[in-house]
Amino acid sequence: MRLTCFILFILLSAIACKSKEEWKTRSIYQIVTDRFARTSDTGTCNFNKYCGGNYRGIINKLDYIKGMGFNAIWISPILENLEDSYHGYHTTNFYKLNDHFGSEADFKELISLCHKNDIWVMVDVNANHVAPIGTDYEKIYPFNSSEHYHNWCEIYDWNNQMQVENCRIAQMPDLKQENDWVTETLLEWVHDLIQKYNIDGIRIDTAMSVPKWFWDQFRDSAGVFQIGEVFNENPGYVADYQRHLDSVFNYPLYYTIRDSFCGSFANLKDYWLHSRNIFPAPEYLGVFVENHDNFRFLFQCNDISKFTNAIIFSLLWEGIPVVYYGGEQYLSGGYDPYNREPLWDNYNTRSTLYQLIAKANYIRKTYNIWNNKIMQRYADENFYAFTRGNILACFTNEISLKRTITDHEFNIGDRLCNLLQEGDCVTVTGGGITISMGDYPKVYVKQ
């Protein structure tokens, strides 16, 4: 009865929420709160502990974020954590904020100032597990009893869904959503959190480790846009979670991007022909090249040209782009925690990638590209091109090559100019559109 009444309350509540249709027009800058910006210049950074980044630091760098054209940020989980758990995924109290990141007033001011600057705020949340406290459940609030958790087992086989949903990730106690009180409490918690702080959207950690039926209820309780982490390269497996949440991160495309820009575009051609059609709504998927769970692109593939092509591709492809902080400054950290390096004193607004990201975001907004489908126009091992509405986007994983695109809808004599580089124009001939690629991608529009 309690759960039924709460769901009815949610349905009757009038909350100002940003829909998935609105979110697909946004471009997201992902921030690890402890590593993006701090307000004190003292102290070194031990990557396994807090380094001093906070909400006030983000506030001070809003112009830096806006300068790249981003109109949404995704920040780390905000709740109280075990000491040294700078990342935010070791929750100890679901009703207290993490004071390492600042006060509640600081957090509210961050959201208020973001909204004044037309920047939406996405908060990372977790409904799967708590801090790794063994069986000392009294250390967790409000889930302070063994009955709130599945029996202790570790995940050894990620292809075994029973283990994925019921066992522990890295020894973190796994919440038991089959317990009505646990589910009711989580639903009320996320609803109240969003209402209290006027949060615009949520990123859901480890979505694949919770039964799908729970996400149907969680989605309704949240009342704002949700995008879930389903860390898997199988398109069918990932796509099924989009039937229970507004969106998921496009991990199959993530692997394809890395393979394509560091290897052969044959992978991307195959993705476009087959994998993308498996998703119920690809226009809402999170598109990314890097994040806090994976080594940075430049660690795997130490080539700034290839990285630049990949980032601009992610901003123009179908879906909601998410750029990981520091990519614009060519951070190249390896495995966790070195992929979460501090950005201190490295806010160069003249870096080539910073400026190209700004131009790509300008193109997104100016041409409303989210209203248009992708049409693949050319694909071989080293060159890839697609049209999306009025734009022709061209990418390379090898510098100094020339290709002629014959599959297009432009007219002979049309003059196309590259919005990423002034003065770079081509004319459509009877033979097609001949593109000469250098280090960087090209985005042409008809003049």
What kind of feature is each model-predicted range?
Residues 27-32, 72-77, 93-95, 120-124, ...:
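Structural recognition of the beta-strand scaffold that forms the well-ordered cores
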Residues 36, 119, 294, 319, ...:
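Generic structural signal for secondary-structure transition and capping sites
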Residues 9-16:
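Hydrophobic h-region of N-terminal signal peptides that target proteins for export
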Residues 1-4:
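Positively charged n-region of N-terminal signal peptides that target proteins for export
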Residues 127, 289-296:
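Active-site neighborhood of divalent metal-dependent phosphoester/pyrophosphate hydrolases
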Residues 38, 91, 96-99, 171, ...:
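Generic structural "secondary-structure junction" signal
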Residues 19-27, 32-197, 212-228, 235-237, ...:
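Substrate-binding/active-site clefts of carbohydrate-active enzymes
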Residues 111, 115, 188-288, 302-305, ...:
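Active-site-proximal helices and loops of the catalytic beta/alpha 8
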